Structures are given as C-alpha cells and as structure tokens.
Amino acid sequence: MAAKPVLYYFNGRGKMESIRWLLAAAGVEFEEVFLETREQYEKLLQSGILMFQQVPMVEIDGMKLVQTRAILNYIAGKYNLYGKDLKERALIDMYVGGTDDLMGFLLSFPFLSAEDKVKQCAFVVEKATSRYFPAYEKVLKDHGQDFLVGNRLSWADIHLLEAILMVEEKKSDALSGFPLLQAFKKRISSIPTIKKFLAPGSKRKPISDDKYVETVRRVLRMYYDVKPH
C-alpha cells in the first residue's frame, strides 16, 4: 500500500489549502506536519529538502515536491482531475488561473491591519462580482454541462468552489446575481468526497486567526508590514 502524502506547512490555509482541497476531493487521505517553531523550519532548510527554501512541500510517490502549482498539477493529473486531453487541460489551466488570481487577493488578508482589511474586503468582493463570477457564469451557460470542462469533475471545479466559499466568507450573498454559480456551488458541494471535506472535523482549515499570523511571522521572521493589493 502506497504511503499517504505528507504535507509540510503551517496549521492554517495559506498556499497549502488548495492542495488539501484537491487531495480531499480525490478521496486521498494525507498526513500533515505543521511548522510551529523557527528551529523546526531551520532544520528543514538545513536538510536540503526544500528546493527553494520555502513551503508548501509535499512528500508524495517518493518525491519531495515544492512550488504550489507543480504540486497541484501532479495531484490533478494523478487522480484524473486534469481533463481527458490537451485541450481540456488548457481550459482547466485557464479557469484555475482566474480563480488563483481571485484567491490571491485574499492570501495576504490575515496579515493586514484592521483598516486595510476593510478596504481589501470591499476590493475582493468588487473584483469577484464584476470580473470573475460573471466570467464563470458565462462558462457554465455556454458549456451547458454540470462541470466547467468536459462532463466530469476537474480541478477547475474544485478550485472555483474553494474561491466561491472564500468570497462568501467576506460577503454571504456574493452569488446573489449568479444563478448558475449558485446551482454549481450546491452541485459540487454535494459530491461525497467534497461534502466530507466541508463537514466539521475534516482537515479543512478555518479562517486564519491571529494565532496563525503570529506563528507564520515567527517561523518565517516576517517583521515587515503587509499591504493590500
């Protein structure tokens, strides 16, 4: 029996959360090693297993993979979530690129000042509802299927659901003008593996709190202020 993937990151969302989502949607159990001290991080650095001296890092199939996109590409391909041919893969990459951009606006959110959080929240909601959600609403309308690409679940669907839920944490009715996305959210959330991941007690991480921010700053020695996009 193959060993479970091992995820090295902080006990919070950050860049690892999309990896957790993808593994969970594929029905893959995984283990996690949480970075909690500077000494622990330096030990990893000294071991040489962090190719570019940064996390996320995932041990899978005898490899120690870094770079979030490379990790996600591998998982999507391994578990048949990356389309049936090159054309579908290109569409998946394009749609994931869009949701990546949207979620990127939220990645730094926990590290912002209270004043900047208010500004960034309004910025994210505006971008989501004026640029990104209309685009995916149109994709669903034009494609006419239950999924964004082809007629089966792909990484693009999983990533979009993750992005939708993140935006709804900032504005609960963000999907009010997008009926196809509302139906999409309900449909994808009902897939058994995803439903399990969304249920209490899963390895899905909550909204990052002050403890998470403090840990990341301490481990990475982040002594600078983070500014909104």
From Swiss-Prot:
<keyword id="KW-0963">Cytoplasm</keyword>
<feature type="binding site">
    <location>
        <begin position="54"/>
        <end position="55"/>
    </location>
    <ligand>
        <name>glutathione</name>
    </ligand>
</feature>
<dbReference type="InterPro" id="IPR010987">
    <property type="entry name" value="Glutathione-S-Trfase_C-like"/>
</dbReference>
<dbReference type="Pfam" id="PF02798">
    <property type="entry name" value="GST_N"/>
</dbReference>
<feature type="modified residue" description="Blocked amino end (Ala)">
    <location>
        <position position="2"/>
    </location>
</feature>
<feature type="domain" description="GST C-terminal">
    <location>
        <begin position="85"/>
        <end position="207"/>
    </location>
</feature>
<dbReference type="GO" id="GO:0006749">
    <property type="term" value="P:glutathione metabolic process"/>
</dbReference>
<dbReference type="GO" id="GO:0004364">
    <property type="term" value="F:glutathione transferase activity"/>
</dbReference>
<dbReference type="GO" id="GO:0006805">
    <property type="term" value="P:xenobiotic metabolic process"/>
</dbReference>
<dbReference type="Pfam" id="PF14497">
    <property type="entry name" value="GST_C_3"/>
</dbReference>
<dbReference type="InterPro" id="IPR036282">
    <property type="entry name" value="Glutathione-S-Trfase_C_sf"/>
</dbReference>
<feature type="binding site">
    <location>
        <begin position="67"/>
        <end position="68"/>
    </location>
    <ligand>
        <name>glutathione</name>
    </ligand>
</feature>
<feature type="binding site">
    <location>
        <position position="9"/>
    </location>
    <ligand>
        <name>glutathione</name>
    </ligand>
</feature>
<protein>
    <recommendedName>
        <fullName>Glutathione S-transferase 3</fullName>
        <ecNumber>2.5.1.18</ecNumber>
    </recommendedName>
</protein>
<keyword id="KW-0808">Transferase</keyword>
<comment type="function">
    <text>Catalyzes the conjugation of GSH to a wide variety of electrophilic alkylating agents. Also involved in the metabolism of lipid hydroperoxides, prostaglandins and leukotriene A4 and in binding of non-substrate hydrophobic ligands such as bile acids, a number of drugs and thyroid hormones. This GST does not exhibit peroxidase activity.</text>
</comment>
<dbReference type="GO" id="GO:0005737">
    <property type="term" value="C:cytoplasm"/>
</dbReference>
<comment type="subunit">
    <text>Homodimer or heterodimer (with a subunit from group CL-4).</text>
</comment>
<dbReference type="InterPro" id="IPR003080">
    <property type="entry name" value="GST_alpha"/>
</dbReference>
<dbReference type="InterPro" id="IPR050213">
    <property type="entry name" value="GST_superfamily"/>
</dbReference>
<dbReference type="InterPro" id="IPR004046">
    <property type="entry name" value="GST_C"/>
</dbReference>
<dbReference type="InterPro" id="IPR036249">
    <property type="entry name" value="Thioredoxin-like_sf"/>
</dbReference>
<feature type="domain" description="GST N-terminal">
    <location>
        <begin position="3"/>
        <end position="83"/>
    </location>
</feature>
<comment type="similarity">
    <text>Belongs to the GST superfamily. Alpha family.</text>
</comment>
<dbReference type="InterPro" id="IPR004045">
    <property type="entry name" value="Glutathione_S-Trfase_N"/>
</dbReference>
